[in-house]
From Swiss-Prot:
Its EC number is 2.4.99.17. The keyword Ribonucleoprotein does not apply. Transfers and isomerizes the ribose moiety from AdoMet to the 7-aminomethyl group of 7-deazaguanine (preQ1-tRNA) to give epoxyqueuosine (oQ-tRNA). GO terms for cellular component: cytoplasm. InterPro entries: QueA (IPR003699), QueA_dom1 (IPR042118), QueA_dom2 (IPR042119), QueA_sf (IPR036100). SUPFAM superfamilies: QueA-like (SSF111337). NCBIfam families: PRK00147.1 (NF001140), queA (TIGR00113). It is found in: Cytoplasm. The gene is queA. This is S-adenosylmethionine:tRNA ribosyltransferase-isomerase. Keywords: Cytoplasm, Queuosine biosynthesis, S-adenosyl-L-methionine, Transferase.
Length: 342
């Protein structure tokens, strides 16, 4: 299959720049790929798509305020670092701008020197490995100095940083939010649980690769980014019990899907506690092993995420649903509306 097979027309005004006032007031397009049906709804009605005994699986990663602005003490030149992943101890892989000024041994100061970074290795495409030095607790220093790394297609300033976190965000480590979860409120989750649905949490730390365009025509040549995931024994046991009792595993977002399917692939369809790195690329032809249904936002044309949804529901039907969403003025991408896929 070709990358262009997943292209569609998207007017720029449909790219949501700000979150809605109420998280669960977004629109929800409910699609059933077997019946070939589409129903326009609202997100708080997602509870009607869930049955007692189902498991709703959510990614509890928390977005780090990973964008840092500093200066080189020798030249006072301005530098921007974007934290990508913690490699070990106080060492991080970062994206640096302007990278050409930052050679091994270069120093950058942030916040009057409260946080210092030393370049210890150079990677391609502006990547660097840095070692941080600071007083106190790193995450607290980062919270006070860093900014939320919003996606490149969002140009408005975010008034409340918590709106780019899910209400259940807990495990620090992402460079981007698992946006399908942004629609849930604490109240809605309580109602879902009261219906007899099991709430299950896993962790996948979302990397910036999630925004990286597919640069090859032939999908088989695409090099998928790696992300760290973790599923606890308690969560795995709940999911096994749900499957055994005939319930469905309903994933919230593509990050939950990728975690569950990575584990399903590793353990021949069984669900086991596990952690590690995944670069799973789910595209048409893939056989799903764990996930029975899911919610997700509307994704970028030609992205690996549109390909994932197409693997589950069929490319032609998914693109038809996307055309419907465009016609009905659904809001797209991170702060946009959602789709529920049966």
């Amino acid at each position: 299959m070709n990358t262009n097979d997943f292209d569609f027309e998207l007017p720029e005004e449909l790219i949501a720049q700000t979150p809605l006032e109420k998280r669960d007031s977004s629109k929800l397009l409910i699609i059933d790929h077997r019946q070939k049906t589409m129903v326009d709804s609202h997100f708080d009605h997602i509870i009607d798509q869930l049955n007692p005994g189902d498991a709703l699986v959510m990614n509890n990663t928390r977005v780090l305020p990973a964008r840092l602005y500093g200066e080189k003490p020798d030249t006072h030149g301005h530098v921007e670092l974007l934290l990508l992943k913690n490699t070990q101890g106080d060492q991080w892989e970062v994206l640096a701008k302007p990278a050409k000024r930052l050679k091994v041994g270069s120093q950058v100061n942030f916040g009057d020197g409260r946080l210092k970074a030393t370049i210890i290795d150079e990677l391609e495409h502006g990547g660097r490995i840095v070692e941080f030095s600071y007083d106190g607790i790193f995450l607290e220093v980062l919270e006070s100095l860093g900014e939320m790394p919003l996606p490149p297609y969002i140009h408005e300033k975010l008034e409340d940083a918590e709106r780019y976190q899910t209400v259940y965000a807990k495990e620090n480590g992402s460079a981007a939010a698992p946006t399908a979860g942004l629609h849930f409120t604490t109240d809605l989750l309580k109602k879902i649980e009261a219906k007899g649905v099991h709430l299950v949490y896993l962790t996948l730390h979302v990397g910036l690769g999630t925004f990286r365009p597919v640069s090859v025509d032939n999908l088989d040549e695409h090099d998928m980014h790696s992300e760290f995931y973790s599923l606890s024994e308690e969560a795995a046991q709940t999911l096994r019990d749900v499957k055994q009792a005939g319930g469905r595993v309903v994933a919230v977002g593509t990050t939950s899907i990728r975690t569950l399917e990575t584990i399903g692939g590793k353990f021949q369809g069984d669900i086991q506690a596990d952690s590690g790195w995944t670069n799973i690329f789910i595209k048409p032809g893939y056989q799903f092993k764990v996930v029975d249904a899911f919610s997700t936002n509307f994704h970028l044309p030609k992205s690996t995420l549109v390909m994932l949804v197409s693997a589950f529901a069929g490319r032609d039907f998914v693109l038809e649903a996307y055309r419907h969403a465009v016609d009905e003025k659904y809001r797209f991408f991170s702060f946009g509306d959602a789709m529920f896929v049966n």
